[in-house]
């Protein structure tokens, strides 16, 4: 096959999509690793993937439940009740949210619209609340997938909020958002919303009630939306780092009228994280006090509808209360065990990390292993690790404010996790030997 023609020779593509195709060398490691992932049976010589935020600890149980409880019938082959979700599923999502998110006012089925995942929900939300070029505020570091969710479809602008050493999930962070809002609007970008990942990805900690209240007051002051991505709501765990962790607090649990016009508050949830099913594309927007936004969201849902099959799988799980009563505590136990294993091994190698109490990843510091304090050096280390058949996510893709941060997914089967860490530490040991540095307690760096 011949090489692809240069971009300037592609007049048949729109300018808006050409922006999506601009070269991004930070994504090249991911592209190289994706189809080489390790599997002990089908690809034993592959790359151990510790970069993707997937919870693999309960996959067997979820798979078993699906296979035992799902059967296609002719109704699944129809358009069903339309693109924004069946009444049955939306009722069960509402019941689930009322039980686990503890909203200050009950969530109802008509407050919810479904789609094919959390990412499409973010895209649709942006499409509805502003114009191309308008901005949505997110603090650094941030989940790298938000770039595509926000910018590739709706053509919103992801406006990055620098933290400069301030904890992103703290009350103090709000001042950074306010300063960034003023700077953005002075340069011509109208800010329409704030997006919080609660719990935070990649840092793995929830926002406190006080911090959420402060963000609500900030958004109310400027009449901008607050979108809370709560896909890790159930993925919390106990650890020696946080024996009494800050509990997950949904934005919906606040007495919102004290802080903000409730019509500005919205939540995204999906099956991907808490239910260990990134590949089953179904999620939702929850907006209890803004019927107009929900109507707008539904008006474009035909482009992002979840399949009847995906909706039925999630519905079956919601309907099985006894399974969920076992499943979530067991998931948390396994998350805690896996987190303890990874952080213990990191400590053996004197590798610092950001303590976490939620999510499936840990944020680590490998800055001492960089050749130089640059993004290119960070990318070079990521490539070296990938070629040594271990893939971790580099901090630059999360717009980390420090070079040398990486994210490791610890919610991985133990054998795979052990193999991946062995490969990681071997590379770090080699680097230390090349520099004449001492090795760690196990012979690794």
Predicted regions and their residues:
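N-terminal small-domain helix-loop-helix segment of the aminotransferase-like
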Residues: 2-117, 124, 168, 172, ...
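Conserved core of the PLP fold type I
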Residues: 74-221, 233-262, 266, 423, ...
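PLP-dependent enzyme catalytic core of the Aspartate aminotransferase-like
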Residues: 95, 103-106, 260-261, 374-376, ...
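Hydrophobic residues in well-ordered beta-strands that form the structural core
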Residues: 138, 160, 228, 392-394
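Helix C-cap/helix->beta junction micro-motif
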Residues: 221-222, 349, 388, 431
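PLP-dependent aminotransferase class I/II
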Residues: 264-358
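Conserved PLP-binding catalytic core of the aspartate aminotransferase-like
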Residues: 335-336, 349-387
